[in-house]
Amino acid sequence: MKTRKIFAALMLSMLASMPTMAQEKYFSPATSEAATPDAEGFIRRWTVLEPISKQNRSNTVFVDSYLRETFAHEYFKNQMTILPKDGQKVKVTFERPKPQPRPAGQPGQPGGAPMDFRRMQQGPVEMETATETLKWHKLDSKHYNFKLMRFGEHEIQRVYGVIYWVVTVINCDQDMNDVRLSVGSNSASQWWVNGEDVLLMSSDRRMVADDCTSHRLNLKKGENIIRGAIINGPGMSDFCVRLVDENGKVIKSGYTIK
């Protein structure tokens, strides 16, 4: 009997540690020291907000007009200007399916539980407004692409029907003219540099490095802010970002990441 209890305790301990072990495979906490682009020029340090629930039964809705309207909606205060700190919390407003009454004795999911895609596919679903508190995490990715799905499943067990907000600050040694932001994302996304809308990546897409590039940008000496929003319904979520020069050559030096 004692042996069984010890075995059960060990199993519970192993199961509890699995999410942390999985997280450590993909990310490490950012340090106070400035980071640099990796050997291929990818920016790996990002401050990421825990995923906001955004119910979509399919990614086919990710056309330009839908994305602009969705990303323009204010989910939290100072959405387009905030420079979040690690661990900072924000109050988020979002929509979720309104819980349906169930027959007495029939188990059901509580309000705010993960999206039921079968229910969504049956037709229009009545939505309700809800609020929750989410937290920012400053992380260094261990891969060139930041695996948002792994981040989401570890932090709040939310992986589908989501919007991720990401921010990073790069510090340029000198003015950098005629550079482009080069991005890959799964699925659709929108990107801003120093508050300017520079790139919209629409449609249901897979993450491919350098999938889209912005117009030519002039980065000033000192701090420059890169902000992104990535949306997905069903499926994996990740992204990668680097800078290229006017000839498409990857920029691997000349700036650090705060």
Residue ranges: model-predicted function:
Residues 1-8:
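Bacterial N-terminal signal peptides that target proteins for export
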Residues 8-17:
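Bacterial N-terminal signal peptides
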Residues 18-22:
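Sec/Tat signal peptide C-region and signal peptidase I cleavage site
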Residues 23-145, 229-258:
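Accessory carbohydrate-binding/adhesion or oligomerization-edge regions at the termini
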Residues 154-164, 202-207:
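Extracellular beta-rich ligand/substrate-recognition surface
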Residues 166-178, 216-221:
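Extracellular and analogous surface-interaction loops
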Residues 177-192, 226:
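Aromatic-lined ligand-binding clefts that engage carbohydrates, nucleic acids, or primary amines
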Residues 193-241:
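Beta-strand-rich ligand-recognition modules
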